Amino acid sequence: MAEEIVLYYFDARGKAELIRLIFAYLGIQYTDKRFGENGDAFIEFKNFKKEKETPFNQVPILEMDNIIFAQSQAIVRYLSKKYKISGNSELNEFYADMIFCGVQDIHYKFNNTNLFKQNETTFLNEELPKWSGYFENILKKNNCNYFVGDDLTYADLAVFNLYDDIETKYPNSLKNFPLLKAHNEFISNLPNIKNYISNRKESVY
């Protein structure tokens, strides 16, 4: 019997999108419950908190066979380990996590710029090129389509999600980073990812 999986988040990409990409890549069926899709998001979220456990009073929340999982980064790591896309050795698991942590750093800076209009010039002229250079160098060193080892890990999906997000606001951000651009094109054309993106609804963030 297949386990029942429900992902709870707002009607947006945000902190849930990497989780959705992991499920898409793996071909795992789940219910994508979005607050605000058919009504008031905050009223729906308030009612949800009355019904379900929310350890930190926030989403995303993942429910698998009546177990509640909270915190987006912890969920990503758990799923990656469970479904064997976390790296095929202890060292590769470390490298994947290292890259994932780097993605969180620059994604945080992008969100401050995109959502809160903070330091846009600094982000575009300094932070984005700097971090893109870091990722470009890692790809160059690994010398293949993947960031870690010779197979896909959640680090690849995390970097793809980062630039998929950034390029909705700042197109051509990867024009000076050929390996990173090729990587994103490679991930976007994986059959399950391509199908997910082509059917993904538009969202404000």
From Swiss-Prot:
| Domain GST N-terminal positions | 3-87
Keyword Transferase (UniProt)? yes
Q: What is its EC number?
A: 2.5.1.18
**What is this protein's record name?**
Glutathione S-transferase
Source organism's superkingdom? Eukaryota
Q: What does this protein do?
A: Conjugation of reduced glutathione to a wide number of exogenous and endogenous hydrophobic electrophiles. May also function as a storage protein or ligandin for parasitotoxic ferriprotoporphyrin IX (hemin).
Kindly state the subunit structure of this protein: Homodimer. In the absence of ligands two homodimers may interact to form a tetramer.
Taxonomic lineage is: Eukaryota, Sar, Alveolata, Apicomplexa, Aconoidasida
Q: What class of enzyme is it?
A: transferase
For this UniProt entry, the molecular function terms from Gene Ontology, in alphabetical order, are:
glutathione transferase activity
Reaction catalysed by this chain?
A: RX + glutathione = an S-substituted glutathione + a halide anion + H(+)
Report the gene name: GST
Which Gene3D superfamilies does the record cross-reference, listed alphabetically?
1.20.1050.10, Glutaredoxin (3.40.30.10)
Q: Where does glutathione bind?
A: 58-59, 71-72, 105, 117, 121
GO BP: any one term: glutathione metabolic process
Question: Does the keyword section mention Transferase?
Answer: yes
Per UniProt, what is one Pfam family of this protein?
GST_N
